[in-house]
Design a protein with these regions (language model features):
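Short, small-residue-biased leader/transition segments that mark boundaries at the very start
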Residues: 4-5
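Short coil/turn connectors at secondary-structure junctions
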Residues: 8-9, 167
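Short helix-loop capping/hinge motifs at secondary-structure junctions, enriched
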Residues: 18-26
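PLP-dependent aminotransferase class I/II
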Residues: 25-52
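Non-catalytic terminal extensions of PLP-dependent enzymes
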Residues: 58-258
Length: 260
């Protein structure tokens, strides 16, 4: 066994029996006791055991299936709103171009196929990559899949700050995208709130509502934006991103090999 110190208060090791060699459980347990943390948090360990039990079939399967269906319903609802707005701008959810309405979800429709425009990853290996339906990345206007900036745009940081002030907290924020996760317990009522707030953002943006009205906490922290409108702020940040080609700079930063 490797000498590893388990510092987490709820560390667990999952062991799958080998087909050719039986695990020496006594030796394994003694070795584990030698290197584990001396201060386990039993309440956390108990919660992990409860969570594992909840995931057992059939109840766990039903809970996961419900989360998957809610995530798909959210994507379909966002596309319905886009259709209702007609030629006006709206947010997109990153994912396959077509979604079935049948139950349960079909694994095939979430696979990434080579050179599909929606994912932009080029010639991916067939059957190797699949989009997790419960992880929804919402795309804001301003940057296309090729990394080209539009004349106007709405940086995701502005949208997520707006959402936070209206009671919606997102997981992660990029330049022109933000991420939400449909974990167990996310219901139609909760994601409907997100759709409603995004519609309200669109209305406030189109009307260039003053920031002191729609983002009062932001203005309180940064009084210099008191007389600026929501569209004005979005345009200013977008123009800065575009001027300095921030999308390409950040991409190169991660792809460039380290120079020594």
């Amino acid at each position: 066994f490797r000498r590893v110190l388990f510092r987490s208060q709820a560390s667990q090791i999952l062991v799958q029996e080998s087909q050719t060699r039986k695990l020496d459980r006594y030796r394994f347990n003694e070795s584990y006791l030698m290197h584990m943390s001396t201060s386990p948090q039993y309440a956390i360990i108990a919660s992990c055991d409860v969570a594992a039990s909840m995931m057992e079939a059939p109840g766990g399967t039903a809970l996961v299936q419900e989360s998957l269906q809610e995530a798909r319903d959210f994507r379909r609802a966002m596309r319905k709103v886009e259709h209702e707005y007609g030629g006006s701008w709206w947010f997109r959810v990153w994912g396959p171009d077509s979604l079935s309405s049948g139950q349960p979800l079909r694994q095939e429709e979430w696979m990434l196929h080579a050179d599909e425009k929606w994912h932009g990853f080029g010639p991916v290996e067939p059957g190797f990559n699949m989009l997790d339906p419960i992880k929804a990345t919402i795309i804001t206007p301003g940057l296309d899949m090729e990394g080209e900036f539009a004349d106007t745009g709405i940086p995701a940081a502005v949208v997520t700050k707006y959402l936070v002030e209206h009671g919606v907290v997102v997981e992660k924020t990029g330049l022109y995208s933000f991420f939400v996760m449909f974990t167990i317990g996310i219901t139609k009522g909760r994601w409907n709130t997100l759709v409603t707030e995004l519609q309200q953002f669109k209305a406030d943006y189109d009307e260039n509502q003053p920031l002191w009205r729609v983002m009062p906490d932001f203005v309180k922290a940064y009084p210099m934006y008191d007389r600026m409108g929501l569209r004005d702020l979005s345009t200013r940040v977008h123009d800065a991103y575009r001027r300095y080609d921030v999308a390409r700079v950040t991409t190169d930063m991660y792809l460039r090999s380290e120079e020594r």
